[in-house]
């Protein structure tokens, strides 16, 4: 699991090129101390059903690969230099552990 980090200005596009993954996003109401009551949205992205997920600014995101050798590509609207001062990180279980639970498929 790699989570959570967010940006106030930067948006991202996420694509799974190989395998599948849970991608979770949550709106940041306050970057210094976000509410743990914010609703987390989960998406299953897979190479079997190709989709691009848009993550707007003011959202935190994270992911959990569901298969060995899963390949995830993140596209950013900011350069690496621009995003350095716009990076906020939170523990993977900040909004609960159930986010990363894999239900029977």
Positions of predicted regions on the chain:
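Non-catalytic, conserved peripheral segments adjacent to functional cores
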Residues: 1-48, 64-105
